[in-house]
């Protein structure tokens, strides 16, 4: 019995399968990391919209992702509520 009983392409296929598995695992980890980072960024933006420096921002999810599409009435109400008042 010699060491070279199997064909040489078996080793190449094994290496390719291992590389694909590593790449898939890396993509999964990268995707989770990006998702968590975006969640953290959107959470800080939501906090800024509640407690801003004098000017409140529109909540991103409220305006763009409602169940029936963009809610124009709610957006208009927010725009008029956030308009700067003139002090004289």
UniProtKB/Swiss-Prot annotation:
Which tissues express it?
Answer: High level of expression in spleen, followed by brain and kidney.
Cystine connections:
none
Q: Which residues cross the membrane?
A: 11-31
Major place of residence: mitochondrion
What triggers or suppresses the expression of this protein? By trimethyltin (TMT), a trialkyltin compound which is a potent neurotoxic agent that selectively damages specific brain regions.
Sequence ranges on the Cytoplasmic membrane side: 32-88
Q: How does it sit in the membrane?
A: Single-pass membrane protein
Q: What InterPro entries does the annotation carry?
A: SNN_cytoplasm, SNN_linker, SNN_transmemb, Stannin, Stannin_sf
Subunit composition and interactions: Monomer.
Family per UniProt?
Belongs to the stannin family.
Q: What is this protein called?
A: Stannin
Question: Which species does this protein come from?
Answer: Rattus norvegicus
């Amino acid at each position: 019995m010699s060491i070279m009983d199997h064909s040489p392409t078996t080793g190449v296929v094994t290496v390719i399968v291992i590389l694909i598995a590593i790449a898939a695992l890396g993509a999964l980890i990268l995707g989770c990391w990006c998702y968590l980072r975006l969640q953290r960024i959107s959470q800080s933006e939501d906090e800024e919209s509640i407690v801003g420096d004098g000017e409140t921002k529109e909540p991103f999810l409220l305006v763009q992702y409602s169940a029936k599409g963009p809610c124009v009435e709610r957006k208009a109400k927010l725009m008029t509520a956030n308009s700067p008042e003139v002090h004289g």
